[in-house]
Amino acid sequence: MPRVYIGRLSYNVREKDIQRFFSGYGRLLGIDLKNGYGFVEFEDSRDADDAVYELNGKELCGERVIVEHARGPRRDRDGYSYGSRSGGGGYSSRRTSGRDKYGPPVRTEFRLIVENLSSRCSWQDLKDFMRQAGEVTYADAHKERTNEGVIEFRSYSDMKRALDKLDGTEINGRNIRLIEDKPRTSHRRSYSGSRSRSRSRRRSRSRSRRSSRSRSRSISKSRSRSRSRSKGRSRSRSKGRKSRSKSKSKPKSDRGSRSRSRSRSKDEYEKSRSRSRSRSRSPKENGKGDIKSKSRSRSQSRSDSPLPAPPSKARSVSPPPKRASRSHSRSRSKSRSRSRSSSRD
């Protein structure tokens, strides 16, 4: 069961006075009075918290008493063992911090900013003062700014009551000013912000995935283009080799067919040259005649032209003189055979 320590008690205090002092804060299970101090046992821990929050520093029988949560190992049924303190009484010399005394703070969205706060006013004093309006779950003083505090309530009605009732009241010689903190008043906004952040993160992730996909697609397209170019080049080379082998394997073709093939190769070669010139000139007219465009136009002209380069002409032209020599040798052999036949006759 929760116990509350009462210090600085008058020696004339009786149990009836303690019951009156704690009336309105729940059911009391037991009262243990000592010389100058005592303990009160509550049925509910919430009632004990409320009593500590509101009754600490209040007057009882002409004395400002200390009301705090009792801490320490229990010796017997009558009470707890506390270290000695100067001035008598069994209050512990190891005083607890304010946060331990008042319990863990609970953050809510019903928040008020307290301005013009006295520098002597601590967060405990501010919390005790604000409990007149309702249940206070969180309090801070001079944390972010000097002469400014923060109060958070359990419900919106408590916050509204404090705003209407305690705005302009005096604490430690200063009239405080209460302002509702609107950005923190609704968790829905924060939830929507977190949702929008998650949505933006999802969008950014999807965008990054799309960009990576488009990059991979562009890379695959460029690879397929380079492969098609290399295939075109290899095909053109193979075609050139085939044409060379055909020209070598058919030395007995007529002169007319040779002239036709020469004229065709010349025409197509001139066409490919004109195409490459027009493609290489077009970027210069647009103001972007770079070296890369020239190399591309050359590679495209090479892949577009199925026939081989001019050197094939020299190889295809080379066979005629051999045939001329063969015809000369045939005429000589014929003349020799005629002369032999005439000599025999």
UniProtKB/Swiss-Prot annotation:
Claim: Ribosomal protein is one of the keywords in the record: no
InterPro entries named in the record: Nucleotide-bd_a/b_plait_sf, RBD_domain_sf, RRM_dom, RRT5_SRSF_SR
Residue numbers carrying N6-acetyllysine: 165
Single Gene Ontology BP annotation: mRNA splice site recognition
Modified residues (Phosphoserine): 45, 81, 84, 299, 301, 305, 316, 318
One MF term in the entry's GO annotations: RNA binding
UniProt family annotation: Belongs to the splicing factor SR family.
Protein name: Serine/arginine-rich splicing factor 6
Gene designation: SRSF6
